Amino acid sequence: MTHPTELPLSPLSALQFYATAPYPCSYLDGRVARSQVATPSHLINSDIYTELVKAGFRRSGVFTYRPYCDGCRACVPVRVPVDAFAPNRTQRRTWKRHRALVATVAALHYDEEHYALYMRYQSARHAGGGMDRDSRDQYEQFLLQSRINSRLVEFRDLDPAENGASTLRMVSMIDILGDGLSSVYTFFDPDESHASFGTYNILWQIEQAKSLRLPYVYLGYWIRESPKMAYKANFHPLEGLVDGRWKVLDPTLADLPPVDAALARAPLPGGHSGTR
């Protein structure tokens, strides 16, 4: 992987970073959030995106961002170092329980069955949040648009009693980075509420990263105060980007008091700093 300072000035030096207007936080009730956005999106290829992810950025479609909130540092970028990862007893049971699932890796593409499962998942898990009303176009913009090396993985249960029949259980979008896999979004059968499909998906990604000789699986943001994010703290060791540096994180002891926007101004790839 080429270090950004060794890259030609263009296109890395052409990236600009902007702060959005405040908007309601989707993770913590009553909070106001802002994001720092990397632009222009067409210059963000897989190599540059790898460096941005290491600096705490994520993507939604072709929109690349990281939290830039005033007075709050609740969102901690986290990743699992796959060679050091040791599954706990519950995770081992989950892996064994779903080992018969058939995973198929494909390019990003639209499938009516995937969209139907997505809508069922949103209606059951995030009712009233807005995404439960996503149109097909919104679904495609959110999950199927990418300018980097991305894949769609579907997981199916095969029915041995029915020749060739299968049941779609889960769909996951992942990005392949220079130093790991980045979990973009996952949705699964909401009728199997205790199946731990999400946990199995991360375990599967860890195994894939190992097979590809990639050192990390990036899990996005962990928020201590958000119950929906609690599962990420169950993967040990877990590294977090705190004060601009990756370090092993102990979620029970993490000292993450609210601060001003200085954290969001942590060094950017290529020596950029600040926001326009």
Swiss-Prot record:
- One GO term describing the cellular component: cytoplasm
- Write down the superkingdom of origin: Bacteria
Q: Where in the cell is it found?
A: Cytoplasm
Q: What is its EC number?
A: 2.3.2.29
Q: Which terms does the UniProt entry file under GO BP?
A: ubiquitin-dependent protein catabolic process via the N-end rule pathway
Single GO molecular-function term?
A: arginyl-tRNA--protein transferase activity
Which of UniProt's keywords are assigned here?
Acyltransferase, Cytoplasm, Transferase
Q: Keyword ATP-binding: yes or no? A: no
- Chief site of localization: cytoplasm
The record's catalysed reaction(s) read: N-terminal L-glutamyl-[protein] + L-leucyl-tRNA(Leu) = N-terminal L-leucyl-L-glutamyl-[protein] + tRNA(Leu) + H(+); N-terminal L-aspartyl-[protein] + L-leucyl-tRNA(Leu) = N-terminal L-leucyl-L-aspartyl-[protein] + tRNA(Leu) + H(+)
Its function, per the record, reads:
Functions in the N-end rule pathway of protein degradation where it conjugates Leu from its aminoacyl-tRNA to the N-termini of proteins containing an N-terminal aspartate or glutamate.
Q: Which family does it belong to?
A: Belongs to the R-transferase family. Bpt subfamily.
The name under which this protein is listed is: Aspartate/glutamate leucyltransferase
Q: In which organism is this protein found? A: Burkholderia pseudomallei (strain K96243)
